[in-house]
From Swiss-Prot:
The keyword tRNA processing applies. NCBIfam families: endA (TIGR00324). Gene3D superfamilies: 3.40.1350.10, tRNA intron endonuclease, N-terminal domain. This is tRNA-splicing endonuclease. The active site is at 110, 116, 147. Homotetramer; although the tetramer contains four active sites, only two participate in the cleavage. Therefore, it should be considered as a dimer of dimers. Keywords: Lyase, tRNA processing.
Length: 170
């Protein structure tokens, strides 16, 4: 994209009414959520697209840079940084990444042009504790909605390792 598309901060999201945003980002690349004539992006999507130079975010006539969006995200979610690392890794690999809060996970991940997601991603820090009940509950939900449960573990260097968790019925 040549000139960044302008988006406006609105609470914990950003939006644009520009047709270019809707066509290039939503229709062609699977970013955001379309509501009426507005394309809404999460802060993580906005940070990613700002870092790539595809959009610019404005709040009260002030442009928010990538670091500003990361700081804003971190102020609202202490795990924003690691969620961003995983989001960026998956997007850079060519996947479509959407929220999976209604499934009790962080992300739903789609192959490009797929109608349904294949994976539910739960993001964790390397030293974060996770109980067997947490793992079982997430694997059970994923199995129930015909998705693969994946734990995305982020180490202190920002590297991500993915572990598939399966529900096996004997």
């Amino acid at each position: 994209m040549k000139k960044p598309i302008e988006f406006y901060l609105s609470g914990d999201r950003v939006y644009s009414t520009r047709e270019k945003a809707i066509n290039q980002l939503y229709n062609n690349r699977g970013y955001g959520e379309l509501k009426g004539d507005k394309l809404f992006l999460s802060l993580i999507e906005a940070a990613y697209l700002t870092e790539k130079g595809w959009i610019k975010v404005v709040d009260k006539d002030k442009e928010l840079k990538f670091d500003d969006l990361m700081k804003l995200g971190k102020s609202r979610d202490e795990d924003f940084d690691i969620k961003y690392i995983v989001y960026k890794d998956l997007r850079d690999r060519g996947y479509i990444v959407k929220s999976a809060l209604k499934f009790g996970s962080h992300y739903r991940v789609y192959r490009k042009d797929a109608e349904h997601s294949d994976w539910l991603i739960w993001v964790l820090r390397e030293n974060q504790r996770l109980s067997p009940n947490d793992i079982t509950a997430r694997a059970r939900v994923a199995h129930g909605v015909r998705k693969n449960m994946v734990l995305a573990i982020v180490d202190e260097d920002g590297d991500v390792v993915y572990y598939k968790v399966e529900w096996i019925k004997f």
